[in-house]
Amino acid sequence: MATALVVGGRGFIGGFIVSALKQRGWQVRVLARPHGRMLAEGEVAGDLLRMLDAEDWAQALQGVSVVVNAAGILREEGRQQFEAIHVRAPLALAQACVSRGVRFVQISALGDPRDGGFIASKHRFDSALLALPLEAIVLRPSVVYSHRGSYGGTSLLRALAAFPWRQLLPGTGDWQFQPVCAEDLAQVAAVACTQGTAGIYDIGCAIPLSLHDYQAQWRRWLRIPGRRSWRVPLPLVRAQVWLGQWLGRGPVNRTIWNMLLRGNLTAAESHQRVQAEFGVQVRDLGEVLDAEPSQMQDRWAALLYFLVPWLKWSVVLLWLWSGIVGLVTDAAVIEAMARGSYLQAMQPVLLARGAGVLDLLLGAGLAWAPRPRPVVLAMLISVAAYALVFGALLPQQFLEPLGGLAKSVALLPALGVLWVLVDRR
């Protein structure tokens, strides 16, 4: 079997490309950062931030006949910069492909470079790639979605469509784009590994959709009642975009907003050109959704989208408040609470202050940790420990009129749900 190297194969789009290649009989090698873990079967170690020269790609390219680059970041953070991820590393890879006669398929993005650094850097590499003496195909998709999952902005749009009673619609919702199913994009990429004239191909469905129509179709597919919309005023939308840009988090940033405002449309005749060149028809959204009925899990994912941050930040505030209370409560009050129990001989004031510091650290950790699951697990352990220890030493806490320690019975499964939901990949 011929071997394909997929860069970004563990991402949303890359995963579908890996699957499509395997369906067509390819042996697939996926570039992956180890992060201290054992590599899975078919993975090869690599880090785009360190593979900035052609010779750095020699091992990954051994026995490879085609490369598919689906790597990308929507915003810069720390060492993750557009220039390195979108330009320098893939250009070094492409230069290494020249001497080995390896074909190159680039997953770029449809848009205007003036929309922001994400688009500008993608298109800058596209031009550099096509200037090299190698067989190169550049695919520029519009908004990419899948009924089998979502990520980033498509998750947000699906959640807006599924909002209880009425969908939430940014502004008037009349912005036009041509969404493409991830499975169709993956099939085009897989075919492009062996055929197609070098050049740039815009990828999108045949008929442009407005944002309102896009969300309405998703709502019908999810079988959520209500056809009306609550229109979110543009100033509020712009404020949310500004906040997301400033925080460096969330599915929306200034580039995505600019792309939406400008409209994300393919060039004339692009749909027909893609079908003629690769033999793949990029389906309209309605056709894709009609092919597969929604399931309960699809509705859960859409309806839980806004509940996840609500749950997360409620837990953050609860832990920070608990920490503050543990640090500022008068020592006499703490000693009075412990009087007559086993805690009286265990320096209860010191225990309360220590627990307060721990709660503050856990609350801050959940708020800012890039990988929050270990923090949530620590919270689970601490709540279970509090319930067991204080339940044994101060059993009267379970009998307080307002619940007191008894509320930990509900808090434990809530933290278990949060542990599952905070992992967005």
Walk through the language-model features, giving the residues of each.
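N-terminal Rossmann NAD(P)H-binding glycine-rich loop of SDR-like oxidoreductase domains
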Residues: 4-24
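Mid/C-terminal beta-alpha module of Rossmann-like enzyme folds, strongest
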Residues: 191-254, 266-308
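NAD(P)H-binding glycine-rich loop region in Rossmannoid oxidoreductase-like domains
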Residues: 36-92, 96-98, 110-113
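Residues forming the Rossmann-fold NAD(P)(H) cofactor-binding site
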Residues: 14-16, 87, 123
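Extended, low-polarity transmembrane helix blocks
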Residues: 252-331, 346-425
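Oxidoreductase cofactor-interface core, primarily capturing Rossmann-like NAD(P)-dependent enzymes
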Residues: 114-222
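Conserved cofactor-binding/catalytic machinery of classical short-chain dehydrogenase/reductase
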Residues: 88-92, 125, 181-184, 362, ...
